Amino acid sequence: MKLCSLQQLVLAVLFIVSNFYLPLAVASPIGWDFAVTLRDKLLFLDNKFKTVSSAAHEFEGISALAFDEAEEVIYFNDQQHQNGSIFSLRRDAAVASHIVEQAVQRIGNGSVSGLAFDPLNRNLFWADMRQSRIYFASVDTLHTEPPKVLVDLSAEGGRPDGVAVDICRRQLYWTNSKINHASVERIGLNGTGRQVIIKENIDMPRGIVIDQQSDRIYWLDDKVGIFFAIESARLDGSDRQLVLEDKHQSPIQLAITDETIYWTDKADKAVWSYPKPANKKLATNATEPVVEPIKLASWKEDVYGIVARTGFYQHLQKDAHCASVVKKVKQRLDNRLNNRTQSRTAVDDRIEELEREHCLNGATYMTKGNFCICQVGFKGARCEISECHNYCVHGTCEISSMGYPKCYCQTDFYGERCEYYKCNNHCLNGGHCTVDRDSGEMSCDCRDNFTGTRCEHNETAHCGSYCQHLKEHPDAFVPAPCMDICEELRLTNATIVREYQSSAFCSDMPSYRQGSLIIVLVVGVVSSLALVAVIVHGFRLIHKPKRPRIKKTFVVRKQARLNSTSDTPLTNRPLATEQCEITIENCCNMNICETPCFDPKLVEQQFSGRDKKSPCVKEDKKILIHNMEDDLLN
């Protein structure tokens, strides 16, 4: 009887061990690094974007995607499903299959555009673009409590698109793609403190993600026309930066890892990547190569959502803002593990031993999710890989306080991973580059006849024009460094390429000659302009039409009548025998001593007391004209 029970125990242990290791080795959920949504399925991809597995083939309108990394659960939506709008997908490692359950029932004619998950309170957030609202609900009480409205944008006509949760600072970020009033906003997870953080120079923002490593947000902006942009800012909207601007794409959602930004493109039905900007760049004189976006994978169907493993358990354990959140999440998972039945058998002890052996380097095994929570500085399905493994190319790697690898480069190298050689393409024309071990400064050892900090000057071509000029004019000025070269060229009877002659000769002309040449040029230009101005003015004077001369004729009588005191030009017209005509210009050019044109009574009285032999003065003409005008008007 005892023998039989012993055999049964051995068989049970072997059966459990085989069923335990097989899922871990073959169907571990850590086997994928990215997940994307096509219209009718989910694809799980490795870090090289090769398809590992697929799921959810029974759906027809999948778009948005969210990932609960603590429980290894994928949340996705289906626009075409009749009853539910959001579903959960969990991988069952024991049977190597996926279990799909309805998470949120459809609310009217809602249309889910973005999904986000909070691992601390286990709340699911989603943006409904059609109803202009942002909802949230607890995944633990979805069957008993309906979803609640966190933000209502219907009154202002908003169009919430992408959503992202800052799990450390307890904030929800979303993009508002309303035309002409687009923005990026945030609000507390408790529904208070709504704030618009980006509203200038933004067209149609789509996906948004939080980078806890750099405390920044990244979002996609589908610009007007053919362009799109990836932009970044601090969590409060300050320090806005343009990460990438490109064209001919239709970006939808994005994800971010330690080093790279990923986004889905509906136009090319592909996933693209671009390096994430470093927080601090080492200042060097070398020019970094221009980086272009890389197309990682493409399909025949439209691609929408994308999520990536961030490993926030490992990386955020020592973060000032995130440490408490990570601790609470781990504590909740540990409590769930400890709530298992207290009745232990030899099989349970053996399983626990296998669990401890499966996760390496002090990692914690999570039974429900069938994965390992690694210690700081390790990664992999079993935490078997050091973060510093092959990370620094030419330097020493250390794990920072945040849990990320950091490189200390050798003197000759720089870059985030010490991948760039300082002397690369620094010295020209075959010069040899060396780096000072103490200061890190670069210097060039140039070949013969080459000078400059980077050996950029060719002395042979530089002095060729002087040598040519010296050949024609033996007394011409030649710089001292060129004398030996000219002598060498004379002995070898060599000629210099003509294209170098003019530029070299002019660039190295003595300073006093250069100054004289500049003065002569300036004086010549000014003189030419003055001559042109004089010629133009002369032509204008010659061809300008003359001003017309105004002529006016007055009819006056030669002698005044006896009763001339009451005569006026209108009541007493002169007779034909008494009148005469004179032009006003001629009248104005005469005075009273000459032939008077008009001799009214007033003028005679003014001149009656004057000596008749006295010479005429200029005032006579003024009085004559004045009285003539008055009498004519009267």
Swiss-Prot record:
LDL-receptor class B repeats lie at residues 122-169, 170-214, 215-260. GO terms for biological process: canonical Wnt signaling pathway; oogenesis; positive regulation of circadian sleep/wake cycle, sleep; spermatogenesis; triglyceride homeostasis. It comes from the Eukaryota. GO terms for cellular component: plasma membrane. Residues 28-515 are extracellular. The chain crosses the membrane at residues 516-536. It is found in: Cell membrane. This is Protein cueball. It comes from Drosophila mojavensis (Fruit fly).
